[in-house]
């Protein structure tokens, strides 16, 4: 389950930290600060994020 502070990995942007989650259901977006890609807002249903421990 994704929440603020969760560390995730994205195929294109690499590792990042979730800084904000907004929206409901299919429109849920996460703002993620990626080490290599900067700050991005992604729709979770398309993002294909892998949660890292």
Which residue ranges define each predicted feature?
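Mixed-charge, Lys/Arg-rich low-complexity intrinsically disordered regions
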Residues: 1-7
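Charged, alpha-helix-enriched surfaces in structured cytosolic catalytic cores
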Residues: 3, 13, 37
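Short coil-to-beta-strand transition motifs
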Residues: 7-15
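Short beta-strand-centered aromatic/proline hotspots
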Residues: 14-22
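Short acidic/glycine-enriched loop/turn segments that link adjacent beta-strands
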Residues: 25-26
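A short macromolecule-binding patch
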Residues: 29-48
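Core RecA-like ATPase module of SF1/SF2 helicases and allied nucleic-acid translocases
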Residues: 51-52
């Amino acid at each position: 389950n994704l929440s603020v502070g969760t560390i995730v990995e994205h195929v294109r942007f690499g590792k990042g930290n979730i800084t904000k989650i907004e929206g409901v259901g299919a429109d849920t977006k996460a703002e993620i600060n990626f080490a290599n890609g900067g700050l991005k807002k992604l729709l979770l249903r398309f993002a294909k994020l892998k949660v890292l421990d």
